[in-house]
UniProtKB/Swiss-Prot annotation:
Stated family: Belongs to the alpha-IPM synthase/homocitrate synthase family.
PROSITE patterns, alphabetized: AIPM_HOMOCIT_SYNTH_1 (PS00815), AIPM_HOMOCIT_SYNTH_2 (PS00816), PYR_CT (PS50991)
Protein name: Putative (R)-citramalate synthase CimA
InterPro entries on file: 2-isopropylmalate_synth_dimer, AIPM/Hcit_synth_CS, Aldolase_TIM, Citramalate_synthase_CimA, LEU1_arch, LeuA/HCS_post-cat, LeuA_allosteric_dom_sf, PYR_CT
Gene from which this protein is expressed: cimA
Pathway(s) of this molecule: Amino-acid biosynthesis; L-isoleucine biosynthesis; 2-oxobutanoate from pyruvate: step 1/3
EC number: 2.3.3.21
Enzyme class: transferase
Subunit organization: Homodimer.
Length: 489
């Protein structure tokens, strides 16, 4: 059995509070979704705005493998806009619960909804569109009416139907029961559309598929209004590894797609989010990592490479000998039992103070205890920042790289960005360093607060973390960045 996926990141996902995507950004995400292997891309609502119309039009002209879809109401103008934008299909919804019918069609009854739905489906078919017809708020509706609505949609030649748990009130058991009843009465392919208001979107989607639904709706990273939609990455992995149900998704592209959506939507993925969160394949505890080095399956349900990730071992107050030895082997160092005891004690001391232990911290501790003096390849000699009102921030930097002086300048969106860009220009002949993440905290209060900057840098397949702490956020950022560079050289 292979399940179809309708990705609604560009429609329902964009309804996440604070998210607004440009046409260019929507095209970028659509191309990534197509490369990922989703079957249907709901690219927006053609009638909603000129931007949505243009996005659907642009995406439809890209020659993607996925079916390009527009959201629509049971209104001719919505259908016309979708067809004029070049969409192949529409996901057209009609209110099915009395709550929604009364709110959207005051004074009208269920028969009116059926009549208008049939008219809209027939008109959409005349316009040459594939029609996926959805019952909105179906989980709070009379199920007999929902089935009646679906049967009339089938008679009107709709291509697919969707049961929408619009406010996320179903339990997995109830979803399974409902899907079985619908499949017994209606022969059209059935999709399910779940929201996460009670944290059950993934479970409800899985139970719906188990019961016979052939398609599910979801978003990358679980984006969506309120608590979000079913997260595609979670559903796909759970279906395949727990139930043996396949999709067309290229799983190794899940992480990169997640990071692209995170970057363009500016909605940060929680670190503990399954599959794509920073901590999903990160290990610290000494006992756990010791077992992990012997057999990765001991504390991982799947290999991180399956979803395009790498296993990360971090050190902190729970660090054990195995973790430290792994890092020392990578550095080519060896320690006596007494030295190892001292290294572990110092690492735990930092963790006990509530601080994150970075790779640079660990290396410094190891080299201090082993009395190894390492000459840093990259040193900051001078830094100048120019910024002000109506002035594009610019930075000039002087570095010594292996004893050779390099001077570069660059602009940026802010002074920190300008400084980092200048450093990257200075080292570009030596290495292509990518900034993976940037995090800043104020350690003390007041305008003279000490700030703690932690950066994550990547070179090839190696990722390191480094810290800088100053009262000047620019200097703290530069210090962290250069410390990380020295870890990668």
């Amino acid at each position: 059995m292979q399940v179809k996926i309708l990705d609604t990141t560009l429609r329902d996902g964009e309804q996440t509070p604070g998210v607004s995507l440009s046409v260019e950004q929507k095209v970028m995400i659509a191309e990534a979704l197509d490369n990922l292997g989703v079957d249907i891309i709901e690219a927006g609502t053609a009638i909603a705005s000129e931007g949505d119309f243009q996005a659907i039009k642009e995406i439809s002209q890209r020659g993607l493998n996925a079916e390009i879809c527009s959201f629509a109401r049971i209104k001719r103008e919505d259908i016309d806009a979708a067809a004029d934008a070049g969409a192949e299909s529409i996901f057209m919804v009609a209110p099915s619960s009395d709550i929604h019918i009364n709110a959207k069609f005051p004074g009208k009854d269920r028969d009116y909804v059926i009549e208008k739905s049939v008219e809209a489906i027939e008109y959409a078919k005349e316009r040459g569109l594939i029609v996926e017809f959805g019952a909105e708020d179906a989980s709070r509706a009379d199920l007999d009416f929902v089935i009646q609505l679906f049967k009339r949609a089938e008679e009107a030649k709709a291509d697919r139907i969707t049961f929408a748990d619009t406010v996320g009130v179903l339990s997995p058991e109830k979803m399974e029961e409902i899907v079985r009843k619908i499949k017994a009465k209606v022969k059209l392919p059935l999709a399910i559309h779940c929201h996460d208001d009670f944290g059950l979107a993934t479970a409800n989607t899985i139970f719906g598929i188990k019961a016979g639904a052939e398609e599910f709706h979801g978003t990358i990273n679980g984006l969506g209004e309120r608590a979000g939609n079913a997260a595609i990455e979670e559903v796909v992995i759970a279906l395949e590894y727990l139930y043996g149900i396949k999709t067309k998704i290229k799983k190794e592209r899940l992480y990169n797609t997640s990071k692209l959506v995170e970057k363009l939507s500016r909605v940060v993925v929680p670190p503990n989010k399954p599959i794509v969160g920073d901590n999903a394949f990160t290990h610290e505890s000494g006992i756990h990592t010791s077992a992990l080095f012997r057999d990765a399956k001991s504390y991982e349900p799947i290999s991180p490479e399956v979803v395009g990730r790498k296993r990360v071992i971090v050190l902190g107050k729970h660090a054990g000998r195995a973790s430290v030895e792994a890092i020392m082997n990578e550095l080519g160092y060896k320690a006596t039992p007494e030295q190892m005891k001292e290294i572990l004690a110092r690492i735990k001391e930092i963790g006990d103070k509530g601080k994150r232990v970075t790779d640079a911290d660990v290396r410094t501790i190891i080299e201090t205890v082993l009395q190894i003096k390492r000459e840093k390849k990259v040193k900051l000699e001078d830094l100048a920042i120019f910024s002000g009102k109506n002035v594009m921030p610019m930075a000039s930097v002087k570095l010594k790289i292996d004893g050779q002086e390099r001077i570069e300048a660059a602009v940026g969106l802010g002074p920190v960005d300008a400084a980092i860009n200048a450093i990257r220009r200075a080292i570009k002949e030596f290495a292509d360093i990518k900034l993976v993440s940037y995090h800043v905290d104020a350690i003390t209060g007041g305008t003279d607060a000490l700030v703690d900057v932690v950066v994550q840098l990547k070179k090839d397949n190696k990722i390191v973390t480094a810290r800088g702490a100053r009262t000047d956020i620019i200097m703290a950022s530069v210090e962290a960045f250069i410390e990380g560079i020295n870890m990668l050289f």
